[in-house]
């Protein structure tokens, strides 16, 4: 087998491989001889089938196996002899002329093909000196704990049925209703319900809906007209007027919830003090998670600005395709277009291309940093992640577990974010971190990019 490098440009490599006809013939004969020893064909004694007969029957299929084995061998040889780190699977090009391929398959001519691949870049990690990030922290106030306690009390509020002639719905009542909603005279998906409980004044339904039920008598019906908010989550309903035919089936008046130790015991806690401590711990966990999202984004921004290196085009294209498929799926589901977002498809493609490049860059960087630092993910950690994933599919836990166990690539997708978080923590220990106390509103301020890119690089770690 002769291997010649024909291209070395940036991260692109290309090699020409020539397998002499004599080598092909030798490999074919070896396979036929092995088959002859085991072949059982009517009319011939075991092990005595003429090679020529076997070749006539199976020669072409065996030669296909020989060629595939030679291609795999060439790929391994190229990687090992040149100490390459391939970024993805190679592209194999066979002879364009059918006659050439036929001659090679008959071992009458040399078999030549090309192997093209991209390699991973060499990243000079260096030190993280000069990288500084700010970590936002917020304290949990007693008022915040009170809000949660009061919300729990509201959720467990007792209700007493309101019965008799002349009973009408008032604010605070729990109304049980049937309703059918229509837009332009046509019923729409999700616009109907039966036996639905609604606390009037809770703001659970579309603005204006609950207020129009006040004063409605038990058993009576009323037509309610509302307009969906312009920013309604279902874009095809946003800003549209809807008419609901509502029937009041039952009413219940609100009682009072006493917030004491007995109330706390209803939530499995020893007393009210323990309940408040538990609530505080939960809020602190939420704040810590929000803080992590923000400082992680800041750290990734700093790393993205610090490091510049060539990216394998294949990985970028793969990441972009994954992003674009999600964008198209979201548009299809929401009914919104690029014009609705104030942009064009061309501009959106350019923006998402930059995001794909960023994700690949950070993924490759974190992979190299983790490798240099000896970061490992234990099987127990992957199994725990798999357990949590399976729990999110009640009744199908075993099916989910078995799927991941049988699909290494799926398991790798579970492993990647765990590995990434460990590498991020390692880098955090090496950079300068300054804690900054802020109000909870600043810490929890909605930032789509925090959510979008909190785990943005893990795709490139798979």
Swiss-Prot record:
One of its GO terms (cellular component) is cytoplasm. Residues 444-455 have a biased composition (Acidic residues). One of its GO terms (molecular function) is ribosome binding. Consists of 3 domains; the N-terminus binds the ribosome, the middle domain has PPIase activity, while the C-terminus has intrinsic chaperone activity on its own. The keyword Cytoplasm applies. PANTHER family: TRIGGER FACTOR CHAPERONE AND PEPTIDYL-PROLYL CIS/TRANS ISOMERASE, TRIGGER FACTOR-LIKE PROTEIN TIG, CHLOROPLASTIC. Belongs to the FKBP-type PPIase family. Tig subfamily. The keyword Methyltransferase does not apply. The lineage of its organism: Bacteria, Pseudomonadati, Pseudomonadota, Alphaproteobacteria, Hyphomicrobiales. Residues 172-257 form the PPIase FKBP-type domain. It catalyses: [protein]-peptidylproline (omega=180) = [protein]-peptidylproline (omega=0). Keywords: Cell cycle, Cell division, Chaperone, Cytoplasm, Isomerase, Rotamase. This is Trigger factor. HAMAP family: Trigger_factor_Tig (MF_00303). Involved in protein export. Acts as a chaperone by maintaining the newly synthesized protein in an open conformation. Functions as a peptidyl-prolyl cis-trans isomerase. It holds the Pfam family Trigger_C. GO terms for biological process: 'de novo' cotranslational protein folding; cell division; chaperone-mediated protein folding; protein transport; protein unfolding. Its EC number is 5.2.1.8. Residues 443-462 are annotated as: Disordered. It is found in: Cytoplasm.
């Amino acid at each position: 087998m002769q291997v010649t490098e024909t291209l070395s440009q940036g991260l692109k490599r290309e090699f020409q491989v020539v397998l002499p006809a004599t080598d092909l013939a030798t490999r074919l004969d070896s396979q036929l001889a092995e088959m002859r020893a085991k072949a059982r064909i009517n009319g011939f004694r075991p092990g005595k089938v003429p090679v020529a007969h076997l070749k006539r029957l199976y020669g072409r299929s065996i030669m296909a196996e020989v060629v595939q084995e030679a291609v795999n061998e060439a790929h391994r040889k190229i990687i090992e002899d040149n100490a390459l780190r391939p970024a993805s699977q190679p592209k194999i090009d066979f002879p364009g002329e059918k006659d050439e391929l036929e001659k090679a398959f008959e071992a009458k001519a040399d078999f030549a093909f090309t192997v093209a691949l991209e390699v991973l870049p060499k990243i000079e990690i260096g030190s993280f000196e000069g990288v500084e990030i700010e970590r936002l922290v917020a304290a949990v106030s007693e008022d915040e704990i009170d809000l949660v306690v009061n919300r729990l009390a509201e959720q467990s509020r007792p209700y007493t049925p309101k019965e008799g002639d002349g009973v009408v719905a008032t604010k605070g009542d729990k109304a049980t209703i049937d309703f059918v909603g229509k837009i332009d005279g046509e019923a729409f998906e999700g616009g109907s319900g039966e036996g639905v409980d609604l606390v009037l004044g809770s703001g659970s339904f579309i603005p204006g809906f609950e207020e129009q039920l006040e004063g409605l008598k038990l058993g009576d019906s009323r037509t309610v007209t509302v307009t969906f908010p312009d920013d309604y989550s279902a874009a095809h309903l946003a800003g549209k007027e809807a008419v609901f035919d509502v029937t009041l089936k039952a009413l219940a008046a609100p009682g009072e919830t006493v917030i004491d130790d007995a109330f706390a015991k209803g939530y499995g806690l020893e007393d009210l003090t323990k309940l408040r401590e538990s609530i505080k711990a939960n809020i602190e966990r939420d704040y810590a998670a929000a803080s992590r999202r923000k400082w992680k984004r800041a750290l990734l921004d700093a790393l993205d600005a610090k490091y510049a290196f060539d990216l394998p085009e294949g990985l970028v294209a793969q990441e972009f395709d994954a992003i674009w498929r999600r964008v198209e799926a979201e548009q299809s589901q929401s009914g919104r277009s690029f014009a609705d977002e104030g942009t064009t498809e061309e501009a959106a493609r350019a923006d998402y291309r930059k995001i794909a490049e960023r994700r690949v860059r950070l993924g490759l960087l974190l992979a190299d940093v983790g490798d240099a630092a000896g970061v490992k993910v234990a099987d127990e950690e992957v199994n725990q992640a798999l357990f949590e994933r399976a729990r999110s599919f009640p009744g199908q836990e075993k099916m989910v577990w078995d799927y991941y166990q049988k699909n290494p690539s799926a398991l790798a997708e579970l492993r990647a974010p765990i590995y990434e978080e460990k590498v991020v923590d390692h880098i955090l220990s090496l950079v300068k971190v300054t804690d900054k106390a802020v109000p909870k509103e600043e810490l929890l301020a909605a930032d789509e990019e925090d959510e979008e890119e909190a785990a943005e690089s893990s795709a490139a770690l798979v």
